[in-house]
Design a protein with these regions (language model features):
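Long C-terminal appendages of very large multidomain proteins
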Residues: 181-427
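Type-3 copper protein
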Residues: 1-202, 402-404, 408-411, 416, ...
Length: 427
C-alpha cells in the first residue's frame, strides 16, 4: 500500500478489556441506523446497475456466438474493468446519486463550521429517500461502520461528555473477515458459526491467485463450510471437491429477464449478482461518502454522532506554499494557507498520489515539507483535476480516552458489523 512503509506488521491483541454500557449504545443506534438504511439503498442500487451491465455483456456474447449459453470466462473478462478495473462509470453514477439523495435529506451551509440534526427529524426523510426493495446479494446484508469516541477520559464518557465519530462505513462487507482479525480473535470458531447463521444461503467466494493485488493480511478468510469456492486455472489445492467451482465448469444463461450462472451438469445455479457478490462487495466497500467534496464542508452531526468531519477541498495546483523553494518561505506560506481557510492545527490530508490520508501538523516544518512534496507529485503526475482534501483531526489529541498503565494516550475505534435482517429478497 505504501512503498517501503509496510515491510513488517505486528498484529496482536492488547491486554485490555472495554465494556460499553447500554446508555452509550442506545445513543449510537438511532443515528447509525439512518446511515445503515442508506447503505442498504447504495448496495441495492449498485446491484441493479451491475445487473444491467452484465446483461448487456451477455447479450453481446450471445450475438457473437449464436448461442444463449455462454461460458463464464469471456463474460468475466469483459466485466472485469467494471468490477476491479479502472472503468468507474457505474461507481461514479451510483455514488453521485447517493450523494444527491443525502443533499436532499440534510442542508449544508458552506459558511457554517458545523451543522447539527436530530435522528428524529431525519428519520422520515431517510426512510422515504432511501427506500430499497431488497438486498441484491447475501454478503450485501453486512455493513461495517468504524466508530470512534471523542472524549478526554473514560470518566468523561461516564459523565456523558463525549461524541461519536464515524471513521468509515464499509458497504456490503464484513470487516471481521480479514485474516488478522480472525486469527487474533479469542474464539475464531464463534465467528465461523455466526456467519453460517447469518447467511443461510451459500456464497460464491473467489480463490485469490498468488498475484492478486490484495495484501495477504487483508484477504477475507471468514467463509461458511457451505460456501462455494470459485477457482480459475489450477490454483485450488486443498479445497473439497463438493465445494469447488472451477471456472471451466460454469456457463451463463437467461431465464426470462434474469441471468443465472450454472454448472454444466446443472447441479448448481446462482443468480448472476449472487455469483459476483464477493467481487461486488470488494468493489463498493469504500464508496460510502455522504457528500460531494466542496470548497468547505461543515462538520455534520446527527445526535451525538459526527457523520462528516469539517473539511476543505482545494485544487492542488492552487496551494502556493507547496511550490515555495525555501523551507522558511514554505512554512510561512503554509501557516497563511491554514489561517486563510480557518483550518485546525492537526489535520488529515487526502492527495491523489497516496491511497490513505496522511497526518499533518501545520506547526511542524517537517510535516509541511512532506505535504508539499505530495502536492507537487500530484501536480507533476498530471492527475486530471487533482485536488487535496483536508479534514479536521477528530477525535483530537486531547480526546483520546484509551490510556495504558503509564498514562500514554492511544487512538482507537470500534469495528462494528451490522447485519441487515432483510434477506436478499423483498425487504
Amino acid at each position: 500500500m505504501y512503498a517501503g512503509r509496510t515491510l513488517v506488521y505486528e498484529d496482536c491483541r492488547r491486554d485490555v478489556e472495554v465494556e460499553i454500557g447500554t446508555d452509550v449504545l442506545e445513543g449510537l443506534s438511532e443515528p447509525l441506523g439512518l446511515l445503515l438504511e442508506s447503505a442498504r439503498w447504495m448496495a441495492w442500487r449498485f446491484g441493479e446497475e451491475y445487473r444491467g451491465a452484465l446483461h448487456e455483456i451477455y447479450l453481446s456474447l450471445v450475438r457473437k456466438s449464436g448461442s444463449t449459453v455462454v461460458d463464464i470466462e469471456p463474460l468475466w473478462l469483459q466485466a472485469e474493468p467494471l468490477l476491479i478495473g479502472s472503468e468507474r462509470r457505474l461507481l461514479d453514477k451510483v455514488r453521485g446519486a447517493f450523494q444527491q439523495k443525502w443533499s436532499e435529506v440534510v442542508s449544508l451551509n458552506p459558511d457554517a463550521r458545523s451543522v447539527q440534526y436530530s435522528s428524529a427529524e431525519l428519520r422520515g426523510r431517510v426512510a422515504a429517500t432511501f427506500a430499497a426493495p431488497r438486498t441484491e446479494w447475501s454478503a450485501a446484508r453486512y455493513h461495517s461502520p468504524d466508530v470512534m469516541i471523542a472524549a478526554e477520559s473514560v470518566d468523561a464518557i461516564r459523565r456523558g461528555q463525549y461524541c461519536f465519530v464515524l471513521g468509515e462505513l464499509h458497504v456490503a462487507t464484513n470487516t471481521m473477515s480479514a485474516a488478522p482479525l480472525v486469527s487474533q480473535h479469542p474464539s475464531p470458531e464463534d465467528l465461523f458459526q455466526a456467519i453460517a447463521v447469518d447467511l443461510r444461503r451459500p456464497r460464491v467466494v473467489p480463490v485469490l491467485p498468488k498475484n492478486a493485488p490484495v495484501p495477504r493480511r487483508a484477504a477475507p478468510v471468514l467463509c461458511s463450510p457451505e460456501d462455494f469456492l470459485l477457482a480459475f486455472g489450477d490454483g485450488a489445492p486443498g479445497i473439497p471437491p463438493a465445494r469447488l467451482l472451477p471456472a471451466s465448469a460454469l456457463v451463463v444463461e437467461a431465464s426470462g429477464s434474469d441471468l443465472f450462472v450454472r454448472t454444466r451438469d446443472h447441479q448448481h445455479r446462482f443468480d448472476i449478482i449472487e455469483f459476483f457478490g464477493s467481487v461486488l462487495s470488494g468493489t463498493i466497500i469504500d464508496q460510502f461518502q455522504l457528500f460531494e467534496p466542496m470548497e468547505h464542508t461543515p462538520r455534520v452531526s446527527i445526535d451525538r454522532l459526527v457523520v462528516q468531519r469539517e473539511s476543505w477541498s482545494v485544487p492542488a495546483s492552487e496551494i502556493a506554499f507547496a511550490f515555495e523553494r525555501l523551507d522558511a518561505d514554505r512554512f510561512l506560506e503554509a501557516r497563511r494557507f491554514r489561517q486563510q481557510h480557518q483550518m485546525p492545527r492537526h489535520v488529515f490530508c487526502k492527495v491523489p498520489v497516496e491511497v490513505k490520508p496522511v497526518y499533518v501538523d501545520f506547526d511542524s516544518a517537517i510535516y509541511v515539507n512532506l505535504l508539499a512534496k505530495l502536492i507537487r507529485r500530484s501536480v507533476e503526475e498530471d492527475r486530471e483535476g487533482a485536488r487535496v482534501t483536508v479534514s479536521e483531526m477528530l477525535p483530537g489529541m486531547q480526546e483520546l480516552w484509551l490510556e495504558d498503565g503509564e498514562g500514554q494516550r492511544y487512538t482507537s475505534e470500534f469495528r462494528i458489523v451490522a447485519l441487515d435482517l432483510c434477506e436478499a429478497t423483498e425487504c
